């Protein structure tokens, strides 16, 4: 799975807290769109905007932090 984010985003931090709590960071490729402009371009190509956090897996993309957190808990807890 890929997680598009940037460090100063409070919603991204909430997702990171869930990932840390579930001890599943090895399941992700983390893509900071402010550190690497190529990641921002990828995100725009995938979703037509730069809204983060954005979780991408084989089924598609998910953007709302609460939805991402619920998904992670339901699949990894």
Q: Where does each model-flagged region fall?
A:
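Residues at alpha-helix termini
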Residues: 22, 46-47, 75
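Short glycine-/acidic-enriched loop or helix-start segments at secondary-structure transitions
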Residues: 15, 40, 65-66
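Non-catalytic, surface beta->alpha helical segment in thiol-disulfide oxidoreductase systems
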Residues: 57-77
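Local sequence-structure signature of Cys/Sec-based thiol-disulfide redox active-site neighborhoods
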Residues: 1-27
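Thioredoxin-like thiol-disulfide oxidoreductase module
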Residues: 32-49
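Structural micro-motif
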Residues: 46-56, 65-66
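Conserved beta-strand scaffold positions in the cores of enzyme catalytic domains, especially
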Residues: 28-32, 61
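Short alpha-helical
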Residues: 10-11, 38, 63
């Amino acid at each position: 799975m890929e997680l598009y984010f940037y460090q100063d985003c409070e919603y991204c931090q909430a997702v990171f807290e869930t990932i840390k709590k579930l001890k599943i960071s090895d399941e992700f490729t983390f893509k900071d769109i402010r550190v690497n402009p190529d990641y921002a371009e990828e995100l725009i190509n995938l979703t037509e905007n730069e809204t983060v956090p954005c979780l991408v897996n084989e089924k598609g993309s998910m953007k709302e932090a609460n939805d991402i957190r619920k998904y992670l808990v339901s699949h990894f807890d």
